[in-house]
């Protein structure tokens, strides 16, 4: 039996004892050392050779990950660790740090209860650190902190132990500020990290050593000793005395919750069903004898096994042959069941509540599906990802014979990675794939060509724009084709606070609201008039429709059709058929024919649509473009070249700081200016640059560029070059 199988054997003896299980994630800014830490933890648990740890990158098992040196998927490893005479099962998920793959982080956070936040001691807390901490805390996932790359402070920055400790204090304070800002109210104090209580560890994942207050008490090795070990090139000796995996996993077991403890407070946040039902009680108590309730957090497409659904089991026991219901997609049968170690699936007979399982047989499942032994179980809350696709490519099969297979592959890819949006046009054969950035789409194309062996042709990258309005417009009369029905809509920009509440999930999507009272209170707290809030009809993207009419006969019967009209407009705006962002539409009046035959879909939908389009024309339509916040570190002598590169791309420098010979720049650059930036900034600075970015929402396209951008989008979509004006919609 191999070491992995042996470990899984041990794991199977532990799984039913939930107090001995920990489901944890590792999150960080890109290149702060997550995957190296993961590998050394796995090596320490005897799952791979210690000599290879940190070099093999067992969780970066994808060929693209190893070639690019970054983590693209969220990989899973189950391992066993002995602590104070007991053996614990630790299910570990390594997540991407690159902003293009942030959707994977969001999904991983649903599966875990605790998280190790890794921060590079030289760079400190970075933008993506804040994003991943916010994602974890939003899912009620408890953090501990590992400050990595301490050897760089000693060897490169030549800091003594006092100077190092000042830097640590700043990093810990920055992390605690984020915890205060984003943690659930009941945990803002309790979840603060501190050195004294052992919730912070320091070390070098690459050199396989760590230190914490509990370890100092045990080994008597202090920060001053660490400086001497590193200066004198004795990190191997240090790694034998202060083993990284022991110190980090001991911290995990001491401070991160077991599934039963975590589910007692997490379930109410991630599932809005009745907690007094059998499945509700079973999930809160993590009962392996209860009904099966699992949330799929990842789909892997395997060339041999097909679709593998990986997810967190919150209740019940899954066995081979179990019939399960999949939310929105009928039934599936468990054909094979496994636990995961990177790319390896180790087959098991059963998986119990509180653990992470890999199942073959749930064909209709996607990331986010609820899987249960109960038909029509209330689904888990949708997972909220903080960014949306900003770049699109048109893709078509080089050989017509490959077209049907390409369509299947694109569907598989959007199942496996829901942050890739696929728009399939079977009539033209041209399909659109939209992703979080250039790298995201590069990796997706690589997989289509190499994993699925389909030759494709693609367009140049296309930026995903949004439309909005600048002021109030309307009421605007929209008439039905038979002229028997008239609707009057007003539109105006939605308050930023309301948009934020929608993006945070406090105001849910759709028109069927379970808890309308709470949503109304949220709207009022964000500055919406109470009477107007009571008229809430529909939320589509970041846009809201309200009905503020009083006592109009037959209106209730046509409301579903008006929702359809509103949804259509919000997905295809009047300027360039792009999605609409941050618009409030108010129905203020309507005149309806008394005979229902004259107010069917073919009459009501065009009338509602034209009313909203016309009001938007009167409200001054504007185009928004996605922007990215770019963080650049360069030596002082290369600063001018870096600034020049940013400004050539319509970028603006927002902040500049200097530490020693290093200059840090913060810039905002439109996504349309970011294509090819990676190679350009490297060549401009002679390769002496470290840079990263995060998506930073949308900004107005400069007025002098708007007409030409709108025209080019419309021509690409086969529309007439000029958008229609209000008179056109009035005459319809």
From Swiss-Prot:
Subcellular locations according to the entry: Cytoplasm
InterPro entries per UniProt: EFG_II, EFG_III/V, EFG_V-like, EFTu-like_2, G_TR_CS, P-loop_NTPase, Ribosomal_Su5_D2-typ_SF, Ribsml_uS5_D2-typ_fold_subgr
Entry function: Catalyzes the GTP-dependent ribosomal translocation step during translation elongation. During this step, the ribosome changes from the pre-translocational (PRE) to the post-translocational (POST) state as the newly formed A-site-bound peptidyl-tRNA and P-site-bound deacylated tRNA move to the P and E sites, respectively. Catalyzes the coordinated movement of the two tRNA molecules, the mRNA and conformational changes in the ribosome.
Positions that bind GTP: 28-35, 94-98, 148-151
Coiled-coil annotated residue ranges, if any: none
Entries under PANTHER family matching the protein: ELONGATION FACTOR-LIKE GTPASE 1, TRANSLATION ELONGATION FACTOR-RELATED
HAMAP family: EF_G_EF_2_A
All residue ranges annotated as the tr-type G domain in the record: 19-228
Any one annotated GO CC term: cytosol
Name the UniProt record assigns to this protein: Elongation factor 2
Family assignment from sequence similarity: Belongs to the TRAFAC class translation factor GTPase superfamily. Classic translation factor GTPase family. EF-G/EF-2 subfamily.
GO molecular function: GTP binding; GTPase activity; translation elongation factor activity
Pfam families: EFG_C (PF00679), EFG_III (PF14492), EFG_IV (PF03764), GTP_EFTU (PF00009), GTP_EFTU_D2 (PF03144)
Residue numbers of Diphthamide PTMs: 598
Main location: cytoplasm
Keyword annotations of the record: Cytoplasm, Elongation factor, GTP-binding, Nucleotide-binding, Protein biosynthesis
Family matches, as SMART domains: EFG_C (SM00838), EFG_IV (SM00889)
């Amino acid at each position: 039996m191999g070491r992995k199988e042996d470990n899984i054997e041990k794991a199977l003896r532990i799984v039913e004892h939930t107090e001995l299980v920990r489901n944890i994630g590792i999150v960080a800014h890109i290149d702060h050392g997550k995957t190296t830490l993961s590998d050394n933890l796995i090596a320490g648990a005897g799952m791979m050779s210690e000599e290879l740890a940190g070099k093999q990158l067992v969780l970066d098992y994808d060929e693209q990950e190893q070639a690019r040196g970054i983590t693209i998927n969220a990989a899973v490893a189950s391992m066993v660790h002995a602590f104070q005479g007991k053996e614990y099962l630790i299910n570990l998920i390594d997540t991407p740090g690159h902003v293009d793959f942030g959707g994977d982080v969001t999904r991983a956070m649903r599966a875990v209860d605790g998280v190790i936040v890794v921060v590079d001691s030289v760079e400190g807390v970075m933008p993506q650190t804040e994003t991943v901490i916010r994602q974890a805390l939003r899912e009620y996932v408890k953090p501990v902190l590992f400050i990595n790359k301490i050897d760089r402070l000693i060897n490169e920055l030549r800091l003594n132990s006092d100077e190092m400790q000042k830097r640590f204090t700043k990093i810990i304070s920055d992390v605690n500020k984020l915890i205060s800002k984003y943690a659930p109210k009941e945990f803002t104090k309790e979840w603060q990290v501190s050195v004294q209580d052992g919730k912070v560890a320091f070390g070098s994942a690459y050199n396989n050593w760590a230190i914490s207050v509990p370890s100092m008490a045990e080994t008597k090795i202090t920060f001053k000793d660490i400086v001497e070990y590193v200066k004198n090139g004795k990190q191997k000796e240090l790694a034998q005395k202060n083993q990284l995996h022991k110190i980090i996993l001991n911290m995990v077991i001491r401070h991160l919750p077991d599934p039963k403890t975590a589910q007692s407070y997490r379930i109410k946040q991630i599932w809005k069903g009745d907690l007094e039902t059998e499945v509700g009680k079973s999930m809160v108590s993590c009962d392996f004898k209860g009904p099966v309730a699992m949330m799929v957090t990842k789909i892997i497409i395997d060339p041999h096994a097909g679709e593998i659904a990986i997810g967190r089991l919150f209740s019940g026991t899954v066995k081979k042959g179990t019939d399960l219901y999949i939310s929105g997609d009928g039934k599936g049968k468990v054909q094979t069941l496994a636990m995961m170690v990177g790319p390896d699936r180790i087959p098991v007979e059963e998986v119990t509540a509180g653990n992470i399982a890999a199942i073959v047989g749930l064909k209709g499942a996607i990331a986010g599906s609820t899987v249960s032994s109960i038909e029509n179980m209330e689904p888990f809350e949708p997972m909220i990802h903080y960014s949306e696709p900003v770049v699109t490519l048109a893709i078509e099969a080089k050989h017509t014979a490959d077209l049907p297979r390409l369509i299947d592959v694109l569907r598989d890819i959007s199942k496996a990675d829901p942050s890739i949006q696929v728009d399939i046009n079977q009539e033209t054969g041209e399909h659109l794939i939209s992703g979080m950035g250039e790298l995201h789409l590069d990796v997706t194309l690589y997989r289509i060509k190499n994993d699925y062996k389909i030759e494709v042709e693609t367009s140049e990258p296309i930026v995903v724009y949004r439309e909005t309005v600048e002021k109030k417009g309307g009421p605007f009369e929209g008439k039905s084709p038979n002229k028997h029905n008239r609707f009057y809509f007003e539109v105006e920009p939605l308050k930023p606070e309301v948009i934020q509440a929608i993006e945070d999930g406090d105001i849910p999507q759709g028109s069927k609201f379970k808890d309308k009272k709470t949503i109304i209170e949220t709207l009022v707290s964000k500055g919406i008039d109470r009477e107007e809030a009571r008229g809430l009809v529909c939320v589509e993207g970041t846009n809201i429709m309200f009905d503020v009419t009083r006592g109009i006969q037959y209106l209730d019967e046509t409301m579903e059709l008006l929702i359809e009209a509103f949804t259509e407009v919000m997905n295809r705006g009047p300027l360039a058929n792009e999605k609409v962002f941050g618009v409030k539409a108010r129905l203020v009046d309507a005149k309806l024919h008394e005979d229902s035959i004259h107010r069917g879909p073919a009459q009501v939908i065009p009338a509602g649509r034209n009313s909203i389009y016309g009001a938007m024309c009167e409200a001054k339509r504007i185009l928004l473009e996605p922007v990215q916040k770019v963080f650049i570190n360069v030596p002082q002598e290369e600063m001018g070249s870096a600034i020049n590169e940013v400004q050539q791309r319509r970028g603006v420098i927002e902040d500049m700081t200097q530490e020693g010979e290093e200059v840090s720049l913060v810039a905002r650059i439109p996504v349309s200016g970011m294509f090819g930036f990676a190679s350009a900034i490297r060549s401009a600075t002679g390769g002496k640059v470290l840079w990263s970015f995060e998506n930073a929402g949308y900004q107005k396209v400069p007025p002098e560029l708007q007409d030409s951008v709108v025209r080019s989008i419309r021509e690409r979509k086969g529309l007439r070059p000029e958008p229609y004006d209000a008179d056109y919609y009035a005459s319809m």
